[in-house]
Amino acid sequence: MSIWKEAKDASGRIYYYNTLTKKSTWEKPKELISQEELLLRENGWKAAKTADGKVYYYNPTTRETSWTIPAFEKKVEPIAEQKHDTVSHAQVNGNRIALTAGEKQEPGRTINEEESQYANNSKLLNVRRRTKEEAEKEFITMLKENQVDSTWSFSRIISELGTRDPRYWMVDDDPLWKKEMFEKYLSNRSADQLLKEHNETSKFKEAFQKMLQNNSHIKYYTRWPTAKRLIADEPIYKHSVVNEKTKRQTFQDYIDTLIDTQKESKKKLKTQALKELREYLNGIITTSSSETFITWQQLLNHYVFDKSKRYMANRHFKVLTHEDVLNEYLKIVNTIENDLQNKLNELRLRNYTRDRIARDNFKSLLREVPIKIKANTRWSDIYPHIKSDPRFLHMLGRNGSSCLDLFLDFVDEQRMYIFAQRSIAQQTLIDQNFEWNDADSDEITKQNIEKVLENDRKFDKVDKEDISLIVDGLIKQRNEKIQQKLQNERRILEQKKHYFWLLLQRTYTKTGKPKPSTWDLASKELGESLEYKALGDEDNIRRQIFEDFKPESSAPTAESATANLTLTASKKRHLTPAVELDY
Protein backbone atom coordinates (compact mmCIF):
# COMPACT_ATOMS: atom_id res chain seq x y z
CA MET A 1 0.00 0.00 0.00
CA SER A 2 1.38 3.43 -1.00
CA ILE A 3 2.48 5.85 1.72
CA TRP A 4 1.43 8.82 -0.43
CA LYS A 5 -2.07 10.31 -0.34
CA GLU A 6 -3.63 12.73 -2.81
CA ALA A 7 -5.26 15.87 -1.31
CA LYS A 8 -6.57 19.33 -2.33
CA ASP A 9 -5.93 22.74 -0.84
CA ALA A 10 -8.52 25.50 -0.35
CA SER A 11 -8.16 26.61 -3.98
CA GLY A 12 -8.79 23.11 -5.29
CA ARG A 13 -5.18 22.46 -6.29
CA ILE A 14 -3.91 18.91 -5.85
CA TYR A 15 -0.92 18.12 -3.63
CA TYR A 16 0.52 14.89 -2.19
CA TYR A 17 1.06 13.99 1.49
CA ASN A 18 3.53 11.42 2.88
CA THR A 19 1.93 9.61 5.80
CA LEU A 20 5.31 8.50 7.22
CA THR A 21 7.44 11.61 6.90
CA LYS A 22 4.47 14.00 7.27
CA LYS A 23 5.81 15.96 4.29
CA SER A 24 3.81 17.27 1.31
CA THR A 25 4.80 18.12 -2.26
CA TRP A 26 3.21 19.53 -5.40
CA GLU A 27 5.02 17.01 -7.59
CA LYS A 28 3.38 13.66 -8.02
CA PRO A 29 5.52 10.91 -6.37
CA LYS A 30 6.96 8.20 -8.59
CA GLU A 31 4.98 5.57 -6.71
CA LEU A 32 1.69 7.15 -7.91
CA ILE A 33 2.72 7.72 -11.50
CA SER A 34 0.80 5.45 -13.92
CA GLN A 35 2.25 3.87 -17.06
CA GLU A 36 0.35 6.41 -19.17
CA GLU A 37 1.78 9.32 -17.21
CA LEU A 38 5.28 7.81 -17.50
CA LEU A 39 4.83 7.56 -21.24
CA LEU A 40 3.67 11.18 -21.43
CA ARG A 41 6.56 12.44 -19.25
CA GLU A 42 9.20 10.55 -21.18
CA ASN A 43 7.93 12.15 -24.39
CA GLY A 44 7.70 15.64 -22.88
CA TRP A 45 3.88 15.78 -22.48
CA LYS A 46 1.57 16.51 -19.54
CA ALA A 47 -2.12 16.00 -18.80
CA ALA A 48 -4.50 18.72 -17.50
CA LYS A 49 -8.22 19.47 -17.17
CA THR A 50 -10.37 22.32 -18.44
CA ALA A 51 -12.94 24.16 -16.32
CA ASP A 52 -15.71 21.78 -17.31
CA GLY A 53 -13.61 18.73 -16.39
CA LYS A 54 -12.47 17.69 -19.88
CA VAL A 55 -8.97 16.18 -20.00
CA TYR A 56 -6.48 17.56 -22.53
CA TYR A 57 -2.74 17.04 -23.16
CA TYR A 58 -0.03 19.65 -23.76
CA ASN A 59 3.70 19.76 -24.43
CA PRO A 60 5.35 22.63 -22.49
CA THR A 61 8.41 22.47 -24.77
CA THR A 62 6.74 22.58 -28.18
CA ARG A 63 3.59 24.35 -26.90
CA GLU A 64 1.42 21.74 -28.61
CA THR A 65 -2.02 20.80 -27.19
CA SER A 66 -4.28 17.84 -27.94
CA TRP A 67 -7.62 16.45 -26.74
CA THR A 68 -6.36 12.88 -27.31
CA ILE A 69 -3.25 11.03 -26.17
CA PRO A 70 -0.46 11.62 -28.73
CA ALA A 71 0.83 8.62 -30.61
CA PHE A 72 4.49 7.94 -29.72
CA GLU A 73 6.93 5.88 -31.74
CA LYS A 74 7.90 3.65 -28.84
CA LYS A 75 7.41 3.37 -25.14
CA VAL A 76 10.07 4.74 -22.80
CA GLU A 77 11.20 3.12 -19.63
CA PRO A 78 10.19 4.74 -16.33
CA ILE A 79 12.07 7.86 -15.31
CA ALA A 80 13.82 6.10 -12.47
CA GLU A 81 15.48 3.69 -14.91
CA GLN A 82 16.65 6.23 -17.49
CA LYS A 83 20.29 7.26 -17.81
CA HIS A 84 20.14 11.01 -18.24
CA ASP A 85 23.87 11.31 -18.92
CA THR A 86 23.54 9.32 -22.18
CA VAL A 87 20.55 11.18 -23.67
CA SER A 88 20.44 14.52 -25.44
CA HIS A 89 17.25 16.18 -26.76
CA ALA A 90 16.70 18.54 -29.61
CA GLN A 91 13.52 20.05 -31.10
CA VAL A 92 13.07 20.61 -34.80
CA ASN A 93 9.77 22.27 -35.85
CA GLY A 94 8.03 20.86 -32.81
CA ASN A 95 9.18 17.22 -33.39
CA ARG A 96 11.26 15.38 -30.82
CA ILE A 97 14.62 13.93 -31.93
CA ALA A 98 16.47 11.68 -29.48
CA LEU A 99 20.12 10.65 -29.66
CA THR A 100 21.17 7.90 -27.27
CA ALA A 101 24.58 6.60 -26.42
CA GLY A 102 23.92 3.56 -28.54
CA GLU A 103 23.35 5.61 -31.74
CA LYS A 104 26.27 6.10 -34.12
CA GLN A 105 27.55 9.61 -34.79
CA GLU A 106 29.01 10.79 -38.03
CA PRO A 107 32.80 11.18 -37.96
CA GLY A 108 34.16 14.60 -37.14
CA ARG A 109 30.92 15.96 -35.58
CA THR A 110 30.20 16.53 -31.92
CA ILE A 111 26.90 16.55 -30.06
CA ASN A 112 27.19 20.31 -29.45
CA GLU A 113 27.56 20.93 -33.16
CA GLU A 114 24.41 18.96 -33.88
CA GLU A 115 22.49 20.78 -31.14
CA SER A 116 23.63 24.09 -32.64
CA GLN A 117 22.50 22.99 -36.10
CA TYR A 118 18.99 21.96 -34.94
CA ALA A 119 18.47 24.72 -32.36
CA ASN A 120 14.94 26.22 -32.40
CA ASN A 121 14.81 29.97 -31.91
CA SER A 122 11.00 30.19 -31.60
CA LYS A 123 9.81 32.62 -28.91
CA LEU A 124 7.29 30.05 -27.70
CA LEU A 125 10.10 27.52 -27.19
CA ASN A 126 12.48 29.90 -25.51
CA VAL A 127 10.36 31.56 -22.86
CA ARG A 128 12.19 32.64 -19.74
CA ARG A 129 10.68 30.86 -16.79
CA ARG A 130 9.31 33.08 -14.03
CA THR A 131 7.94 32.55 -10.61
CA LYS A 132 4.17 32.78 -10.26
CA GLU A 133 4.45 36.12 -8.48
CA GLU A 134 6.57 37.55 -11.31
CA ALA A 135 4.43 36.08 -14.08
CA GLU A 136 1.06 37.19 -12.65
CA LYS A 137 1.19 40.79 -13.87
CA GLU A 138 2.37 39.86 -17.37
CA PHE A 139 -0.18 37.06 -17.65
CA ILE A 140 -3.04 39.45 -16.79
CA THR A 141 -1.58 42.02 -19.21
CA MET A 142 -1.65 39.33 -21.89
CA LEU A 143 -5.34 38.69 -21.20
CA LYS A 144 -6.10 42.41 -21.34
CA GLU A 145 -4.17 42.96 -24.58
CA ASN A 146 -6.02 40.10 -26.24
CA GLN A 147 -9.34 41.65 -25.10
CA VAL A 148 -10.31 38.60 -23.12
CA ASP A 149 -13.68 39.01 -21.42
CA SER A 150 -16.31 36.90 -19.71
CA THR A 151 -17.43 35.50 -23.04
CA TRP A 152 -14.15 33.56 -23.28
CA SER A 153 -13.82 30.05 -21.93
CA PHE A 154 -10.59 28.74 -20.46
CA SER A 155 -10.29 26.16 -23.23
CA ARG A 156 -10.36 29.02 -25.74
CA ILE A 157 -7.46 30.69 -23.91
CA ILE A 158 -5.48 27.45 -24.12
CA SER A 159 -6.17 26.94 -27.82
CA GLU A 160 -5.70 30.57 -28.93
CA LEU A 161 -3.22 32.25 -26.58
CA GLY A 162 -1.25 29.08 -25.86
CA THR A 163 -0.29 28.78 -29.52
CA ARG A 164 0.76 32.38 -30.22
CA ASP A 165 1.66 34.28 -27.02
CA PRO A 166 4.90 33.31 -25.18
CA ARG A 167 3.65 34.85 -21.94
CA TYR A 168 1.21 31.99 -21.59
CA TRP A 169 4.17 29.64 -20.98
CA MET A 170 6.05 31.70 -18.36
CA VAL A 171 4.62 29.22 -15.88
CA ASP A 172 4.23 26.02 -17.85
CA ASP A 173 3.55 23.32 -15.31
CA ASP A 174 0.47 24.62 -13.52
CA PRO A 175 -2.72 25.05 -15.64
CA LEU A 176 -4.75 25.50 -12.44
CA TRP A 177 -2.75 28.64 -11.66
CA LYS A 178 -3.44 29.97 -15.14
CA LYS A 179 -7.13 29.37 -14.66
CA GLU A 180 -6.88 31.12 -11.30
CA MET A 181 -5.34 34.14 -13.01
CA PHE A 182 -8.12 34.09 -15.60
CA GLU A 183 -10.74 34.12 -12.83
CA LYS A 184 -8.88 36.91 -11.02
CA TYR A 185 -8.67 38.95 -14.21
CA LEU A 186 -12.41 38.64 -14.75
CA SER A 187 -13.11 39.63 -11.15
CA ASN A 188 -10.89 42.74 -11.31
CA ARG A 189 -12.06 44.22 -14.61
CA SER A 190 -12.38 48.00 -14.73
CA ALA A 191 -15.68 49.84 -14.84
CA ASP A 192 -15.05 50.73 -18.49
CA GLN A 193 -14.52 47.10 -19.38
CA LEU A 194 -17.69 46.08 -17.55
CA LEU A 195 -19.71 48.82 -19.27
CA LYS A 196 -18.33 47.79 -22.64
CA GLU A 197 -19.23 44.16 -22.03
CA HIS A 198 -22.65 45.18 -20.81
CA ASN A 199 -23.30 47.08 -24.04
CA GLU A 200 -22.10 44.20 -26.21
CA THR A 201 -25.14 42.07 -25.48
CA SER A 202 -25.10 40.46 -28.88
CA LYS A 203 -21.51 39.37 -28.35
CA PHE A 204 -22.48 37.93 -24.99
CA LYS A 205 -25.44 36.04 -26.44
CA GLU A 206 -23.30 34.52 -29.15
CA ALA A 207 -20.62 33.40 -26.68
CA PHE A 208 -23.18 32.25 -24.12
CA GLN A 209 -24.98 30.09 -26.66
CA LYS A 210 -21.66 28.69 -27.86
CA MET A 211 -20.86 27.72 -24.27
CA LEU A 212 -24.27 26.03 -24.02
CA GLN A 213 -23.60 24.15 -27.25
CA ASN A 214 -20.32 22.80 -25.87
CA ASN A 215 -22.09 21.48 -22.78
CA SER A 216 -23.31 18.01 -23.68
CA HIS A 217 -25.54 17.82 -20.61
CA ILE A 218 -27.89 20.57 -21.82
CA LYS A 219 -30.71 19.12 -23.90
CA TYR A 220 -33.83 20.60 -25.48
CA TYR A 221 -35.83 19.61 -22.39
CA THR A 222 -33.38 21.15 -19.85
CA ARG A 223 -34.88 23.84 -17.64
CA TRP A 224 -33.17 26.99 -16.40
CA PRO A 225 -32.72 25.87 -12.74
CA THR A 226 -30.97 22.72 -13.94
CA ALA A 227 -28.88 24.64 -16.45
CA LYS A 228 -27.74 27.09 -13.77
CA ARG A 229 -26.24 24.23 -11.78
CA LEU A 230 -24.50 22.86 -14.87
CA ILE A 231 -22.91 26.18 -15.90
CA ALA A 232 -22.37 27.71 -12.46
CA ASP A 233 -18.56 27.56 -12.82
CA GLU A 234 -18.45 28.81 -16.40
CA PRO A 235 -16.68 32.23 -16.53
CA ILE A 236 -19.21 33.67 -18.94
CA TYR A 237 -21.97 32.96 -16.46
CA LYS A 238 -20.04 33.55 -13.28
CA HIS A 239 -18.33 36.84 -14.20
CA SER A 240 -20.59 38.33 -16.86
CA VAL A 241 -22.09 41.74 -16.06
CA VAL A 242 -25.20 40.86 -18.04
CA ASN A 243 -28.22 40.59 -15.77
CA GLU A 244 -29.86 37.31 -14.87
CA LYS A 245 -32.92 38.05 -16.99
CA THR A 246 -30.83 38.36 -20.16
CA LYS A 247 -28.93 35.17 -19.35
CA ARG A 248 -32.17 33.31 -18.84
CA GLN A 249 -33.68 34.71 -22.03
CA THR A 250 -30.54 33.80 -23.99
CA PHE A 251 -30.73 30.30 -22.54
CA GLN A 252 -34.41 30.10 -23.48
CA ASP A 253 -33.65 31.25 -27.01
CA TYR A 254 -31.06 28.51 -27.28
CA ILE A 255 -33.50 25.94 -25.90
CA ASP A 256 -36.14 27.15 -28.36
CA THR A 257 -33.63 26.56 -31.13
CA LEU A 258 -33.01 23.04 -29.85
CA ILE A 259 -36.76 22.43 -29.62
CA ASP A 260 -37.26 23.69 -33.17
CA THR A 261 -34.42 21.49 -34.36
CA GLN A 262 -35.91 18.54 -32.50
CA LYS A 263 -39.34 19.22 -33.98
CA GLU A 264 -37.92 19.65 -37.46
CA SER A 265 -36.01 16.40 -37.08
CA LYS A 266 -39.16 14.62 -35.92
CA LYS A 267 -41.13 16.24 -38.73
CA LYS A 268 -38.65 15.06 -41.36
CA LEU A 269 -38.62 11.60 -39.85
CA LYS A 270 -42.41 11.48 -39.78
CA THR A 271 -42.65 12.82 -43.33
CA GLN A 272 -40.34 10.05 -44.50
CA ALA A 273 -42.31 7.50 -42.47
CA LEU A 274 -45.63 8.68 -43.94
CA LYS A 275 -44.20 8.50 -47.46
CA GLU A 276 -43.05 4.93 -46.92
CA LEU A 277 -46.37 4.08 -45.21
CA ARG A 278 -48.29 5.44 -48.22
CA GLU A 279 -46.29 3.20 -50.55
CA TYR A 280 -46.78 0.26 -48.18
CA LEU A 281 -50.57 0.72 -47.94
CA ASN A 282 -50.93 1.35 -51.68
CA GLY A 283 -49.21 -1.94 -52.32
CA ILE A 284 -51.63 -3.73 -50.01
CA ILE A 285 -54.88 -2.04 -51.06
CA THR A 286 -54.36 -1.87 -54.82
CA THR A 287 -53.06 -5.44 -55.15
CA SER A 288 -55.83 -6.96 -53.06
CA SER A 289 -57.72 -9.78 -54.78
CA SER A 290 -60.94 -8.70 -53.07
CA GLU A 291 -63.54 -6.86 -55.18
CA THR A 292 -64.09 -4.38 -52.35
CA PHE A 293 -61.69 -2.24 -50.34
CA ILE A 294 -59.79 -3.74 -47.43
CA THR A 295 -61.61 -2.48 -44.37
CA TRP A 296 -59.82 -0.63 -41.60
CA GLN A 297 -60.41 -3.55 -39.25
CA GLN A 298 -58.87 -6.00 -41.73
CA LEU A 299 -55.89 -3.71 -42.19
CA LEU A 300 -55.47 -3.37 -38.44
CA ASN A 301 -55.72 -7.11 -37.83
CA HIS A 302 -53.33 -8.32 -40.54
CA TYR A 303 -51.10 -5.64 -42.06
CA VAL A 304 -49.98 -3.00 -39.54
CA PHE A 305 -48.24 -2.70 -36.18
CA ASP A 306 -47.39 -5.93 -34.37
CA LYS A 307 -49.66 -7.94 -36.68
CA SER A 308 -47.18 -7.64 -39.55
CA LYS A 309 -43.47 -8.50 -39.45
CA ARG A 310 -42.92 -6.47 -42.60
CA TYR A 311 -44.41 -3.40 -40.94
CA MET A 312 -42.39 -3.87 -37.75
CA ALA A 313 -39.17 -4.29 -39.76
CA ASN A 314 -39.35 -0.67 -40.93
CA ARG A 315 -37.72 1.45 -38.21
CA HIS A 316 -39.32 4.65 -39.52
CA PHE A 317 -42.79 3.29 -38.74
CA LYS A 318 -42.03 3.41 -35.00
CA VAL A 319 -42.94 7.12 -34.88
CA LEU A 320 -46.40 6.52 -36.39
CA THR A 321 -49.59 6.28 -34.36
CA HIS A 322 -52.90 4.56 -35.11
CA GLU A 323 -54.27 7.95 -36.12
CA ASP A 324 -51.47 8.47 -38.66
CA VAL A 325 -52.10 5.08 -40.25
CA LEU A 326 -55.87 5.67 -40.26
CA ASN A 327 -55.48 9.07 -41.94
CA GLU A 328 -53.26 7.63 -44.67
CA TYR A 329 -55.70 4.75 -45.16
CA LEU A 330 -58.60 7.20 -45.53
CA LYS A 331 -56.63 9.32 -48.00
CA ILE A 332 -55.93 6.30 -50.19
CA VAL A 333 -59.53 5.08 -50.00
CA ASN A 334 -60.85 8.56 -50.77
CA THR A 335 -58.53 8.81 -53.75
CA ILE A 336 -59.77 5.48 -55.11
CA GLU A 337 -63.40 6.49 -54.47
CA ASN A 338 -62.86 9.81 -56.24
CA ASP A 339 -61.38 8.00 -59.24
CA LEU A 340 -64.40 5.69 -59.35
CA GLN A 341 -66.76 8.64 -58.97
CA ASN A 342 -65.05 10.46 -61.83
CA LYS A 343 -65.38 7.40 -64.03
CA LEU A 344 -69.05 7.09 -63.04
CA ASN A 345 -69.65 10.76 -63.86
CA GLU A 346 -68.04 10.30 -67.26
CA LEU A 347 -70.29 7.28 -67.86
CA ARG A 348 -73.35 9.26 -66.74
CA LEU A 349 -72.42 12.08 -69.09
CA ARG A 350 -72.16 9.67 -72.01
CA ASN A 351 -75.46 8.05 -71.02
CA TYR A 352 -77.10 11.47 -70.68
CA THR A 353 -76.20 12.25 -74.27
CA ARG A 354 -77.49 8.87 -75.40
CA ASP A 355 -80.70 9.34 -73.38
CA ARG A 356 -81.31 12.73 -74.99
CA ILE A 357 -80.76 11.32 -78.48
CA ALA A 358 -83.14 8.43 -77.70
CA ARG A 359 -85.84 10.87 -76.50
CA ASP A 360 -85.47 13.01 -79.62
CA ASN A 361 -85.82 9.91 -81.80
CA PHE A 362 -88.93 8.80 -79.91
CA LYS A 363 -90.54 12.25 -80.34
CA SER A 364 -89.95 11.88 -84.07
CA LEU A 365 -91.64 8.48 -83.87
CA LEU A 366 -94.72 10.03 -82.21
CA ARG A 367 -95.06 12.46 -85.11
CA GLU A 368 -94.76 9.61 -87.63
CA VAL A 369 -97.31 7.13 -86.21
CA PRO A 370 -100.10 6.15 -88.68
CA ILE A 371 -102.81 7.66 -86.49
CA LYS A 372 -102.56 11.35 -85.77
CA ILE A 373 -102.27 12.08 -82.07
CA LYS A 374 -105.06 14.35 -80.88
CA ALA A 375 -106.12 15.76 -77.53
CA ASN A 376 -108.24 12.67 -76.85
CA THR A 377 -105.76 10.04 -78.08
CA ARG A 378 -104.94 7.28 -75.59
CA TRP A 379 -101.70 5.32 -75.10
CA SER A 380 -103.48 2.11 -76.06
CA ASP A 381 -104.30 3.69 -79.43
CA ILE A 382 -100.69 4.13 -80.48
CA TYR A 383 -98.94 1.32 -78.60
CA PRO A 384 -99.62 -1.38 -81.25
CA HIS A 385 -98.04 0.88 -83.89
CA ILE A 386 -94.78 1.60 -81.98
CA LYS A 387 -94.05 -1.47 -79.87
CA SER A 388 -91.66 -3.00 -82.42
CA ASP A 389 -89.97 0.20 -83.55
CA PRO A 390 -86.24 0.45 -82.54
CA ARG A 391 -86.79 4.05 -81.49
CA PHE A 392 -89.29 2.83 -78.91
CA LEU A 393 -87.12 -0.11 -77.80
CA HIS A 394 -84.06 2.13 -77.33
CA MET A 395 -86.06 4.26 -74.90
CA LEU A 396 -86.66 1.38 -72.50
CA GLY A 397 -84.60 1.58 -69.30
CA ARG A 398 -83.38 5.12 -69.97
CA ASN A 399 -83.02 7.78 -67.30
CA GLY A 400 -85.34 10.77 -67.44
CA SER A 401 -88.74 10.93 -69.10
CA SER A 402 -90.29 7.61 -70.13
CA CYS A 403 -92.16 6.86 -73.34
CA LEU A 404 -95.49 7.39 -71.59
CA ASP A 405 -94.31 10.76 -70.24
CA LEU A 406 -93.33 11.94 -73.70
CA PHE A 407 -96.64 10.73 -75.13
CA LEU A 408 -98.65 12.57 -72.45
CA ASP A 409 -96.59 15.70 -73.10
CA PHE A 410 -97.55 15.43 -76.76
CA VAL A 411 -101.24 14.99 -75.87
CA ASP A 412 -101.07 17.97 -73.49
CA GLU A 413 -99.78 20.11 -76.34
CA GLN A 414 -102.79 19.09 -78.41
CA ARG A 415 -105.15 19.85 -75.53
CA MET A 416 -103.63 23.30 -75.13
CA TYR A 417 -104.15 23.86 -78.86
CA ILE A 418 -107.82 22.78 -78.62
CA PHE A 419 -108.31 24.98 -75.56
CA ALA A 420 -106.95 27.99 -77.44
CA GLN A 421 -109.15 27.26 -80.47
CA ARG A 422 -112.16 26.81 -78.17
CA SER A 423 -111.71 30.33 -76.84
CA ILE A 424 -111.63 31.62 -80.43
CA ALA A 425 -114.73 29.56 -81.27
CA GLN A 426 -116.61 30.93 -78.27
CA GLN A 427 -115.88 34.48 -79.40
CA THR A 428 -116.97 33.55 -82.92
CA LEU A 429 -120.35 32.31 -81.63
CA ILE A 430 -120.83 35.59 -79.80
CA ASP A 431 -119.94 37.55 -82.93
CA GLN A 432 -122.38 35.44 -84.99
CA ASN A 433 -125.16 35.96 -82.39
CA PHE A 434 -125.50 32.23 -81.95
CA GLU A 435 -128.37 31.34 -79.59
CA TRP A 436 -128.37 28.19 -77.50
CA ASN A 437 -131.63 26.31 -77.55
CA ASP A 438 -132.02 24.26 -74.39
CA ALA A 439 -134.75 22.24 -76.05
CA ASP A 440 -132.33 20.85 -78.62
CA SER A 441 -130.24 17.79 -77.91
CA ASP A 442 -126.45 17.96 -77.65
CA GLU A 443 -126.09 16.30 -81.03
CA ILE A 444 -128.26 18.88 -82.79
CA THR A 445 -126.50 21.70 -80.99
CA LYS A 446 -123.13 20.27 -82.05
CA GLN A 447 -124.16 20.16 -85.71
CA ASN A 448 -125.35 23.77 -85.58
CA ILE A 449 -122.10 25.00 -84.03
CA GLU A 450 -119.95 23.03 -86.49
CA LYS A 451 -121.72 24.71 -89.39
CA VAL A 452 -120.97 28.13 -87.90
CA LEU A 453 -117.28 27.36 -87.38
CA GLU A 454 -116.76 25.72 -90.76
CA ASN A 455 -118.06 28.86 -92.45
CA ASP A 456 -115.61 31.04 -90.53
CA ARG A 457 -112.24 31.76 -92.18
CA LYS A 458 -110.38 31.49 -88.86
CA PHE A 459 -111.02 27.75 -88.85
CA ASP A 460 -110.06 27.03 -92.46
CA LYS A 461 -106.85 25.28 -91.36
CA VAL A 462 -108.46 23.36 -88.51
CA ASP A 463 -109.39 19.82 -89.49
CA LYS A 464 -112.85 18.41 -88.85
CA GLU A 465 -111.69 16.14 -86.04
CA ASP A 466 -110.26 19.09 -84.12
CA ILE A 467 -113.45 21.13 -84.81
CA SER A 468 -115.45 18.25 -83.37
CA LEU A 469 -113.28 18.29 -80.23
CA ILE A 470 -113.65 22.09 -79.99
CA VAL A 471 -117.45 21.88 -80.23
CA ASP A 472 -117.57 19.04 -77.69
CA GLY A 473 -115.59 21.25 -75.36
CA LEU A 474 -117.99 24.18 -75.87
CA ILE A 475 -121.06 22.04 -75.21
CA LYS A 476 -119.44 20.48 -72.15
CA GLN A 477 -118.47 23.90 -70.87
CA ARG A 478 -122.07 25.20 -71.32
CA ASN A 479 -123.55 22.14 -69.61
CA GLU A 480 -121.18 22.59 -66.69
CA LYS A 481 -122.25 26.22 -66.36
CA ILE A 482 -125.92 25.22 -66.40
CA GLN A 483 -125.29 22.58 -63.76
CA GLN A 484 -123.36 25.07 -61.68
CA LYS A 485 -126.21 27.57 -61.96
CA LEU A 486 -128.78 24.99 -60.88
CA GLN A 487 -126.57 23.93 -58.02
CA ASN A 488 -126.21 27.53 -56.87
CA GLU A 489 -129.99 28.03 -57.06
CA ARG A 490 -130.56 24.90 -54.98
CA ARG A 491 -128.00 26.03 -52.44
CA ILE A 492 -129.60 29.50 -52.17
CA LEU A 493 -133.04 27.94 -51.76
CA GLU A 494 -131.76 25.68 -49.00
CA GLN A 495 -130.23 28.71 -47.28
CA LYS A 496 -133.56 30.59 -47.47
CA LYS A 497 -135.35 27.57 -46.02
CA HIS A 498 -132.81 27.40 -43.23
CA TYR A 499 -133.19 31.11 -42.45
CA PHE A 500 -137.01 30.69 -42.36
CA TRP A 501 -136.60 27.82 -39.91
CA LEU A 502 -134.40 30.03 -37.73
CA LEU A 503 -137.14 32.68 -37.86
CA LEU A 504 -139.63 30.16 -36.50
CA GLN A 505 -137.19 29.16 -33.78
CA ARG A 506 -136.64 32.75 -32.68
CA THR A 507 -140.36 33.46 -32.72
CA TYR A 508 -141.82 30.41 -31.02
CA THR A 509 -139.00 28.70 -29.12
CA LYS A 510 -136.80 31.36 -27.59
CA THR A 511 -139.66 33.76 -26.72
CA GLY A 512 -141.90 31.02 -25.37
CA LYS A 513 -144.73 32.15 -27.61
CA PRO A 514 -147.05 29.27 -28.62
CA LYS A 515 -146.97 28.04 -32.19
CA PRO A 516 -150.17 28.96 -34.12
CA SER A 517 -152.46 26.05 -34.80
CA THR A 518 -152.77 26.79 -38.52
CA TRP A 519 -150.44 28.05 -41.26
CA ASP A 520 -152.83 30.85 -42.16
CA LEU A 521 -152.47 32.35 -38.67
CA ALA A 522 -148.71 32.00 -38.80
CA SER A 523 -148.57 33.46 -42.31
CA LYS A 524 -150.32 36.62 -41.14
CA GLU A 525 -147.95 36.88 -38.19
CA LEU A 526 -144.69 36.27 -40.14
CA GLY A 527 -145.62 37.81 -43.47
CA GLU A 528 -143.65 41.01 -42.97
CA SER A 529 -140.33 39.35 -42.07
CA LEU A 530 -137.41 39.25 -44.53
CA GLU A 531 -137.03 35.49 -44.20
CA TYR A 532 -140.68 35.04 -45.19
CA LYS A 533 -140.39 37.34 -48.19
CA ALA A 534 -137.10 35.76 -49.31
CA LEU A 535 -138.91 32.55 -50.26
CA GLY A 536 -141.07 34.54 -52.70
CA ASP A 537 -143.95 32.55 -54.12
CA GLU A 538 -142.78 29.29 -52.57
CA ASP A 539 -145.73 29.15 -50.17
CA ASN A 540 -145.77 25.37 -50.19
CA ILE A 541 -142.20 25.31 -48.92
CA ARG A 542 -143.01 27.77 -46.11
CA ARG A 543 -146.06 25.70 -45.17
CA GLN A 544 -144.05 22.46 -45.11
CA ILE A 545 -141.32 23.99 -42.90
CA PHE A 546 -143.97 25.42 -40.55
CA GLU A 547 -145.73 22.08 -40.21
CA ASP A 548 -142.45 20.22 -39.59
CA PHE A 549 -141.26 22.78 -37.03
CA LYS A 550 -141.49 21.77 -33.36
CA PRO A 551 -140.98 24.57 -30.83
CA GLU A 552 -139.29 22.28 -28.29
CA SER A 553 -136.58 21.25 -30.82
CA SER A 554 -133.44 23.36 -30.97
CA ALA A 555 -131.62 21.27 -33.57
CA PRO A 556 -131.69 22.22 -37.27
CA THR A 557 -134.12 20.43 -39.45
CA ALA A 558 -133.05 17.60 -41.66
CA GLU A 559 -133.45 19.83 -44.67
CA SER A 560 -131.17 22.50 -43.22
CA ALA A 561 -128.57 19.92 -42.26
CA THR A 562 -128.71 18.54 -45.75
CA ALA A 563 -128.34 22.05 -47.11
CA ASN A 564 -125.22 22.60 -45.02
CA LEU A 565 -123.71 19.35 -46.19
CA THR A 566 -124.55 20.18 -49.76
CA LEU A 567 -123.00 23.61 -49.40
CA THR A 568 -119.83 22.16 -47.88
CA ALA A 569 -119.53 19.46 -50.47
CA SER A 570 -120.07 21.87 -53.32
CA LYS A 571 -117.04 23.91 -52.30
CA LYS A 572 -114.66 20.96 -52.56
CA ARG A 573 -112.72 20.46 -55.77
CA HIS A 574 -113.29 17.12 -57.36
CA LEU A 575 -109.96 15.27 -57.67
CA THR A 576 -109.18 13.00 -60.58
CA PRO A 577 -106.18 10.67 -61.10
CA ALA A 578 -103.13 12.35 -62.62
CA VAL A 579 -102.81 9.58 -65.21
CA GLU A 580 -105.71 7.39 -66.20
CA LEU A 581 -104.62 3.95 -67.29
CA ASP A 582 -106.94 3.08 -70.17
CA TYR A 583 -105.50 -0.27 -71.20
From Swiss-Prot:
Phosphoprotein listed as a keyword: yes
PROSITE patterns linked to this entry: FF, WW_DOMAIN_1, WW_DOMAIN_2
A Pfam family annotated for this UniProt entry: FF
Localization annotation: Nucleus
Consequence the record notes for mutating L340A: Wild-type growth at 36 degrees Celsius
Effect ascribed to mutating L274A: Temperature sensitive growth at 36 degrees Celsius
Effect of L344A: Wild-type growth at 36 degrees Celsius
Alphabetically ordered keywords of this record: mRNA processing, mRNA splicing, Nucleus, Phosphoprotein, Repeat, Ribonucleoprotein
Result when mutating L347I: Wild-type growth at 36 degrees Celsius
GO terms classed as biological process: mRNA 5'-splice site recognition; mRNA splicing, via spliceosome
Paired cysteines (S-S): none
Entries under InterPro entries matching the protein: FF_domain, FF_domain_sf, Prp40-like, WW_dom, WW_dom_sf
Residue ranges annotated for the FF domain, each copy included: 132-188, 201-257, 262-332, 354-413, 427-488, 491-552
Designated name of the protein: Pre-mRNA-processing protein PRP40
Native source species: Saccharomyces cerevisiae (strain ATCC 204508 / S288c) (Baker's yeast)
Gene this protein is translated from: PRP40
